[in-house]
């Protein structure tokens, strides 16, 4: 328990009170409980300079009656917290700042890697302009840089030159040509406080010939163009003439006039368009856009120039990739490839699946823009047997539901071909043919009369003989013209009564030959005209002629 000694030690702490307060406090020992409560309220009001949290931690006086007042003790008061000096903020402003950030250079727009053609000086034309990486057909962008933390600098000079693609990034023999370019280097001056950004417009690449490589490199090194201090190389055959990098480096002078250089930065590689080893890949056309999922479909692909030993045709989806089957002999003049499609990963697909087909260079992995290709489900009837069977089966339901279920009317409507249609194309149209059309053009090659074996007439006098006498009972000759209907008399033969010869009298004029002028044979007519339009073969005409009594058999041929 706290002793009276502790109460006496705490008494000096109460010296902070006034003299009147000390006298009133000394009387509290012999006073009643009401007076102790008054003292407690007084302490709460004044607080001795302490806040409410500290008062809650101090022991509170409890009224115990007059007999126990002698044992009341007061605990030690906690020291007040140190007050914050009013000049602390002023000292914070007087603290010396740290080292200022060092200015540096960044590339905000990379040059486009592919699509730029390097041109020789002897071509006598502009080398073009390097576009930005985000350039499209609709909007063109340019390579751009930006200076950072250069607010206190008045002027900064930025230098751009060409270096190797790989380490140690030596100076490249090719040169930059265009606006603000001299000696193969582009130099621009920027004022960071005005505009810290700059875009390189009309910046092209001019290539040199192999025999000029060494001289071009030495000339640049003498001008101090070597951002990485890599020096020159004796064996210049290692220089890759088809790819370069653009190195940007900034320099400035401080207030004392000392020259400072920022760290050089490199762009992405820029490839020559005309080189097949580094050019951009592009598919122009494919002859087919779909094929079976089993693969093996032969396709023809047209593209830009590629290397036949460094190209592959890839079919892919998000979870599958297959390569086409072809050899170097299937690459035609670097612009066409004949290949066979690979089988799809799932041969039992029930619906068509669309995949991407693109070109890929094996050395650097560069790919072309993909084109769609559709895999079709497997055809279980590859030889078309089922289709042929279905094609041969009659449409029973269709025939029974029609007005002519047995096809009788359709057969009746079919016109039977006429025999003369094969010889006289104008029969149906009623055209007239002149008599000369039925006469052979060459009488030597096409004889007027044709004798068939076994149908030769008996020998008789020739018509041209002087002693020929007309005999009506003699049998007539059988010719191919007898197969045609009888023609109207073109000429009349009149036999003179007084002479022995026959006199042929021609008609007054040629009469047109028409099929309408022929009289159809009646039921009682029997002759060769009745055979026209029949379906008999030529050897059957003989039997028909002999059986009808039209012809009499002649002597057998020996």
UniProtKB/Swiss-Prot annotation:
The keyword Nucleus applies. One of its GO terms (molecular function) is protein kinase binding. The keyword Membrane does not apply. GO terms for biological process: antigen processing and presentation; cellular response to osmotic stress; circadian regulation of gene expression; myeloid dendritic cell differentiation; negative regulation of DNA-templated transcription; negative regulation of interferon-beta production; non-canonical NF-kappaB signal transduction; T-helper 1 cell differentiation. Residues 22-50 are annotated as: Leucine-zipper. Residues 103-418 form the RHD domain. Keywords: Activator, Biological rhythms, Cytoplasm, Cytoskeleton, Nucleus, Phosphoprotein, Repressor, Transcription, Transcription regulation. One of its GO terms (cellular component) is chromatin. It is found in: Nucleus; Cytoplasm, Cytoskeleton, Microtubule organizing center, Centrosome. The modification Phosphoserine is found at residues 19, 552. InterPro entries: Ig-like_fold (IPR013783), Ig_E-set (IPR014756), IPT_dom (IPR002909), IPT_NFkappaB (IPR033926), NFkB/Dor (IPR000451), p53-like_TF_DNA-bd_sf (IPR008967), RelB_leu_zip (IPR032399), RelB_RHD_N (IPR030496). Residues 1-21 are annotated as: Disordered. The modification Phosphothreonine is found at residue 84. Phosphorylation at 'Thr-103' and 'Ser-573' is followed by proteasomal degradation. A motif (Nuclear localization signal) lies at residues 387-391, 411-416. Both N- and C-terminal domains are required for transcriptional activation. Component of the NF-kappa-B RelB-p50 complex. Component of the NF-kappa-B RelB-p52 complex. Self-associates; the interaction seems to be transient and may prevent degradation allowing for heterodimer formation p50 or p52. Interacts with NFKB1/p50, NFKB2/p52 and NFKB2/p100. Interacts with NFKBID. Interacts with BMAL1 and the interaction is enhanced in the presence of CLOCK. NF-kappa-B is a pleiotropic transcription factor which is present in almost all cell types and is involved in many biological processed such as inflammation, immunity, differentiation, cell growth, tumorigenesis and apoptosis. NF-kappa-B is a homo- or heterodimeric complex formed by the Rel-like domain-containing proteins RELA/p65, RELB, NFKB1/p105, NFKB1/p50, REL and NFKB2/p52. The dimers bind at kappa-B sites in the DNA of their target genes and the individual dimers have distinct preferences for different kappa-B sites that they can bind with distinguishable affinity and specificity. This is Transcription factor RelB. It comes from Mus musculus (Mouse).
């Amino acid at each position: 328990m706290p002793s009276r000694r502790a109460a006496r030690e705490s008494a000096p702490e109460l010296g902070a009170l006034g003299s009147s307060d000390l006298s009133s406090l000394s009387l509290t020992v012999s006073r009643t409980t009401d007076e102790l409560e008054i003292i407690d309220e007084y302490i709460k009001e004044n607080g001795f300079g302490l806040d409410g949290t500290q008062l809650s931690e101090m022991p509170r006086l409890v009224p115990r009656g007059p007999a126990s007042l002698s044992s009341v003790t007061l605990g030690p008061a906690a020291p007040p917290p140190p007050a914050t000096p009013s000049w602390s903020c002023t000292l914070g402003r007087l603290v010396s700042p740290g080292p200022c950030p060092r200015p540096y250079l960044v590339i905000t727009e990379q040059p486009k890697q592919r699509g730029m053609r390097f041109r020789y000086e002897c071509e006598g034309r502009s080398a073009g302009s390097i576009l930005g990486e985000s350039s499209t057909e609709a909007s063109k962008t340019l390579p751009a840089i930006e200076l950072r933390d250069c607010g206190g600098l008045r002027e900064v000079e930025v230098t751009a030159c060409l270096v190797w693609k790989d380490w140690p990034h030596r100076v490249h023999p090719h040169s930059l040509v265009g606006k603000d370019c001299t000696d193969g280097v582009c130099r621009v001056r920027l004022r960071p406080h005005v505009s810290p950004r700059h875009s390189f417009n009309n910046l092209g690449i001019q290539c040199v010939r192999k025999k000029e490589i060494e001289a071009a490199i030495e000339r640049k090194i003498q001008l101090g163009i070597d951002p990485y201090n890599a020096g020159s190389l004796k064996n210049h055959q290692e220089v890759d003439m088809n790819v370069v990098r653009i190195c940007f480096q900034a320099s400035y002078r401080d207030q004392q006039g000392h020259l400072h250089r920022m760290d050089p930065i490199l762009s992405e590689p820029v490839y020559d368009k005309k080189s097949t080893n580094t050019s951009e890949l592009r598919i122009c056309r494919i002859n087919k856009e779909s094929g079976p999922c089993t693969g093996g479909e032969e396709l023809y692909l047209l593209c830009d120039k590629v290397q036949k030993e460094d190209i592959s045709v890839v079919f892919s989806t998000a979870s599958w990739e297959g390569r086409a089957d072809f050899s170097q002999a299937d690459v035609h003049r670097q612009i066409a490839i004949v290949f066979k499609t690979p089988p799809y990963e799932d041969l039992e697909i029930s619906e068509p699946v669309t995949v991407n087909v693109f070109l890929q260079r094996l050395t650097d992995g560069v790919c072309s823009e993909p084109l769609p290709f559709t895999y079709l489900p497997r055809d279980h009837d590859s030889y078309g047997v089922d289709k042929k069977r279905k094609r041969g089966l009659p449409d029973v339901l269709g025939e029974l539901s029609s007005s002519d279920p047995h096809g009788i009317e359709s057969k009746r409507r079919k016109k039977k071909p006429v025999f003369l249609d094969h010889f006289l194309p104008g029969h149906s149209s009623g055209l007239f043919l002149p008599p000369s059309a039925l006469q052979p053009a060459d009488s030597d090659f096409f004889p007027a009369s044709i004798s068939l074996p076994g149908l030769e007439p008996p020998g008789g006098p020739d018509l041209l003989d002087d002693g020929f006498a007309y005999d009506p009972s003699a049998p007539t000759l059988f010719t191919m013209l007898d197969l045609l209907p009888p023609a109207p008399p073109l000429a009349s033969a009149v036999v003179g009564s007084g002479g022995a010869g026959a006199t042929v009298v021609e008609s007054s004029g040629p009469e047109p030959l028409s099929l309408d002028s022929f009289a159809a044979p009646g039921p009682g007519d029997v002759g060769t005209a009745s055979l026209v339009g029949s379906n008999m073969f030529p050897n059957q005409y003989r039997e028909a002629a002999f059986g009808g009594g039209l012809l009499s058999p002649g002597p057998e041929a020996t």
